[in-house]
Design a protein with these regions (language model features):
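Structural micro-motif
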Residues: 106-108, 126-136
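Thiol-/selenol-based redox modules, centered on thioredoxin-like
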Residues: 131-170
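Structural microenvironment flanking redox-active thiols in thiol-disulfide oxidoreductases
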Residues: 66-104, 115-119
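Short active-site neighborhood of thiol/selenol oxidoreductases, capturing the structured segment around
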Residues: 44-66, 72
Length: 170
């Protein structure tokens, strides 16, 4: 009986958020979260107006996440030239995001998903106990046109997102 209980417990830990991941062609779900300035950000205020790059990352001020955020920062002008809004989402709180954004001079929106409700809405998978790193490129109609899932290479999310934006018909 103990072995059975342990097996079920391990399944829950590793696959506890096993919700279907959003895919190309899906509509971005409606959500509201606080940004790094404590303001409520409603995705519906930007859907239908411009392309979006929504990237989920594990944690502020960690090696891979800092590299990824700084890569988005360094390419921010390219995103704005293409009319896209960059949005980073993690489970960190508003204060952590504010510090992270200021420390690394991040010019884009960071959203605090403390209960991981939006991460779950998107079905972003975990790798063991680590929250996943997934980037979604969204067209003006609010449809996902590209999904890139790679936990270990944060900066590659930037190049993949820029390439995907280039394929969106305006």
């Amino acid at each position: 009986m103990k072995k059975y209980f342990l097996f079920i417990l391990l399944l829950m830990i590793f696959f506890g958020n096993a919700q279907a991941q959003l895919k190309v062609g899906d509509k971005v779900p409606s959500f509201q979260l606080q940004d790094q300035d404590g303001q409520t950000f409603d995705i519906n205020t930007v859907l239908g107006k411009q392309p979006l790059v929504i990237y989920f990352y594990p944690k502020d001020e960690t090696g891979g996440c800092t590299k990824e955020a700084c890569s988005f920062r360094d390419s921010y002008e390219e995103f704005t030239k293409r009319g896209a809004k960059v949005i980073g989402i993690s489970g960190d709180d508003v204060a952590s995001h504010k510090s992270f954004a200021e420390h690394h001079r991040l010019p884009f929106t960071l959203l605090a998903d403390k209960g991981n409700k939006v991460r779950k809405l998107f079905g972003v998978p975990r790798t063991f106990l680590i929250p996943g790193r997934v980037t979604y490129v969204v067209d003006k109609q609010g449809l996902i046109t590209y999904v890139f899932n790679n936990l270990t290479d944060g900066p590659k999310h930037v190049t993949q997102a820029l390439e995907a934006l280039g394929r969106i018909k305006h």
